[in-house]
């Protein structure tokens, strides 16, 4: 088989979705499955829907278009990054809903929707402290009123995002504040909100321990479904599988070399050279895998093998006395950043399998 290769176990993704849906359902919280770390794979999307996700979301409109082209047409799709004005027509065509913070963008979406003879759903995002996207709390009602009075768009809900930019953790106080804003908006705009999206996989620590979810009825889950982990502490969540993704790469050199480089040293290809530990000799393997293919942070080699460094196209490993030869394939588990880059690299073959 071709390498490097990302193997995707679709049943593991369905299992994780099913587990999270069953855990969140008693709280009245549905799951929007986020496909961006799979490059909008229709197969991954179908697995999420099989597991009970109530909708799908992605940060790139191109990925949402890929879902539709791949036959995923029977569920609500949400663009989870604030739309670009230049893509307003594409957003209206390929997404049912988008997360928004700017009146100018909302107006562009409205104009595009009217020209296409349709309407587009708007979820207004609220800034609750992580300092990425979001309308200041004091301005939320005014922005929502603007949506309500603008033909072509429909005020669908409120949402927030935490833990992505500044690491601010979702907690009961943050979620209560969002719920209180929902009541304020519903009263001021004289209409109910169908979606109150409390955040992403980082919300699961809160959601699975809270006694009161308030008005929160949606979470946008990617990492937890795909990797079985939560982003705050990279902890494996109870009942979730961590074997949905495996990256395979081929060994192209195995040689015993000195433990330390020699000669005058300066910057390496990506800045400061990686530290090398003193010693006499290292049995070193090079794998045909580089930063063009994945992120070295979050890339875990087989047990007992040590990563020495990675450049654009080469991964250097200390394989010790492991039985490793040229032409062999080694398997790697992935953290979120490593998965995201591997899934989006054109040099990594994707192979979806169904273990059911």
Regions found by a protein language model. Name each.
Residues 1-3, 141-149, 232-242:
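Short aromatic-glycine motifs in intrinsically disordered, low-complexity regions
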Residues 1-8, 12:
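Generic N-terminal amphipathic, Lys/Arg-enriched alpha-helix
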Residues 5-7, 29-176, 180, 188:
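Active-site-proximal beta-alpha core segment in soluble small-molecule metabolic enzymes
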Residues 23-29:
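A short, Lys/Arg-enriched amphipathic alpha-helix followed by its capping loop at the start of a domain
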């Amino acid at each position: 088989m071709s390498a490097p290769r990302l193997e995707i176990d679709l049943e593991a993704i369905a299992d994780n979705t099913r587990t999270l849906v069953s855990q969140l359902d008693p709280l009245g919280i549905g799951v929007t499955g986020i496909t961006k770390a799979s490059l909008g794979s229709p197969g991954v999307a179908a697995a999420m829907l099989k597991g009970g996700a109530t909708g799908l979301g992605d940060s790139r409109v191109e990925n949402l278009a890929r879902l539709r082209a791949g036959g995923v047409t029977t569920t609500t799709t949400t663009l989870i990054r604030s739309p670009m004005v230049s893509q307003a027509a594409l957003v209206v065509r390929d997404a049912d809903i988008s997360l928004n913070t700017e009146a100018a963008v909302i107006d562009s979406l409205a104009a595009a929707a009217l020209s296409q003879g349709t309407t587009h759903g708007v979820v207004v995002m609220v800034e609750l402290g992580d300092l990425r996207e979001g309308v200041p709390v004091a301005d939320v009602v005014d922005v929502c009123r603007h949506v309500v009075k603008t033909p072509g768009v429909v005020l669908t809900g409120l949402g927030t995002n935490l833990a992505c930019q500044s690491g601010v953790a979702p907690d009961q106080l943050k979620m209560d504040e969002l719920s209180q804003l929902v009541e304020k908006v519903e009263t001021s705009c004289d209409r109910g909100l169908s979606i109150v999206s409390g955040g992403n996989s980082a919300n699961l620590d809160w959601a699975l321990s809270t006694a009161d979810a308030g008005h929160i009825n949606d979470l946008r889950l990617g990492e937890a479904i795909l990797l079985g982990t939560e982003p705050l502490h990279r902890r494996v969540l109870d009942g979730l599988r961590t074997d949905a993704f495996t990256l395979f790469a081929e060994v192209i050199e195995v040689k015993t070399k000195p433990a330390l480089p020699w000669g005058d040293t300066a910057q390496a290809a990506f800045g400061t050279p990686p530290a090398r530990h003193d010693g006499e000799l290292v049995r070193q393997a090079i794998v045909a895998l580089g930063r063009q293919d994945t992120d070295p942070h979050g890339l875990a080699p087989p047990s007992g093998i040590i990563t020495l460094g990675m450049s654009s196209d080469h991964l250097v490993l200390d394989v010790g006395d492991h039985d490793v030869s040229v032409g062999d394939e080694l398997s790697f588990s992935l953290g979120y950043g490593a998965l995201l880059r591997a899934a989006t690299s054109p040099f990594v073959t994707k192979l979806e399998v169904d273990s059911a």
